[in-house]
Amino acid sequence: MGETVTIQKNWQELIRPNKLQVTPGSDATRFATVVAEPLERGFGQTLGNALRRILLSSLQGAAVQSVHIDGVLHEFSSIAGVREDVTDIVLNIKDISIKMQGEGPKRMVVKKQGPGAVTAGDIQTVGDIVVLNPDLQLCTLDEGAEIRMEFTVATGKGYVPAERNRPEDAPIGLIPIDSLFSPVRKVSYKVENTREGQILDYDKLTMTIETNGAISPEDAVAYAARILQDQLNVFVNFEEPRKEVAQEIIPDLAFNPAFLKKVDELELSVRSANCLKNDNIVYIGDLVQKSEAEMLRTPNFGRKSLNEIKEVLAQMGLHLGMEVPGWPPENIDELAKRFEDHY
């Protein structure tokens, strides 16, 4: 048992943040600042660097893999009536941000006549594909010019170069495109000192995250943390020790185990706590047996203190004037120690 307790102290006695503080940016679907504090010294840098790398490289997203442009044989061509050459059009296509439900590959098409600009918003999509930056300009058409492009969209992670997006049986005219699947566009972090109580040398981790809108920054951090957790599991070579459960012992008690909690652990005012101490009321089991009249006879104990104690007991489902059979038990100190995690 002693060895188990020592092992558990390795992680149980480290300070941990209670929750993340998330501050949305101008567009909550794309920008946010996430703060975690307090962290043990050094953990800000450790977690910040690991989460940043995962956010940028390992989250699933959707992107264009290839494009077929009618009348174009390769990316070094030009199109009559289109001001941009095909190389520039391909560079613009790489910047299309997409959200797609389900697996790919899937198709989407744009067909337009000039004059005017062709934007990502002109793309005809199926129901489970959404173009997130419809104002992105793909090319410009002169009077009488026409263009038709068919895109192949797939899901993946990280960055995939065009060479890997070219299928072995690629038809003539299919132009593979570099794909940036990650829905996270930018991540930065900083680590500062923070205070916890009187201790000043804890870490505060602040992460600033920008996504393409396919995922919120808060969800992106959650997925990255889950990936890190899953990857680290293989390094844990032991089972989590099981604690004794109170249910196995409670049937042997003739009273509510909450009565074994000491009154000085209750959130009482100094005046009320001192009055209980002076009256030798140590455990809640001692307190609940007292009547209101008995409490008011306690020196320096007034109606305000009485109401405070009644409110605290009510929050625990208890009250003054209760009957507690079998109280106090002979081994009260030992029982209190065994049940301290269960009331």
From Swiss-Prot:
Region (Alpha N-terminal domain (alpha-NTD)): 1-239
Reactions that this protein is recorded to catalyse: RNA(n) + a ribonucleoside 5'-triphosphate = RNA(n+1) + diphosphate
Family annotation (Gene3D superfamilies): 5' to 3' exonuclease, C-terminal subdomain, DNA-directed RNA polymerase, insert domain, RNA polymerase, RBP11-like subunit
Record-level GO cellular component terms: cytoplasm; DNA-directed RNA polymerase complex
MF (Gene Ontology): DNA binding; DNA-directed RNA polymerase activity; protein dimerization activity
UniProt enzyme class: transferase
Keywords annotated in UniProt: DNA-directed RNA polymerase, Nucleotidyltransferase, Transcription, Transferase
InterPro entries reported for this sequence: DNA-dir_RNA_pol_insert, DNA-dir_RNA_pol_RpoA/D/Rpb3, DNA-dir_RpoA, RBP11-like, RNAP_asu_C, RNApol_insert_sf
Entries under Pfam families matching the protein: RNA_pol_A_bac, RNA_pol_A_CTD, RNA_pol_L
Chain positions covered by the region annotation Alpha C-terminal domain (alpha-CTD): 255-343
Subunit record text: Homodimer. The RNAP catalytic core consists of 2 alpha, 1 beta, 1 beta' and 1 omega subunit. When a sigma factor is associated with the core the holoenzyme is formed, which can initiate transcription.
Domains: entry comment: The N-terminal domain is essential for RNAP assembly and basal transcription, whereas the C-terminal domain is involved in interaction with transcriptional regulators and with upstream promoter elements.
Chain's role: DNA-dependent RNA polymerase catalyzes the transcription of DNA into RNA using the four ribonucleoside triphosphates as substrates.
Family the UniProt entry places it in: Belongs to the RNA polymerase alpha chain family.
Protein name: DNA-directed RNA polymerase subunit alpha
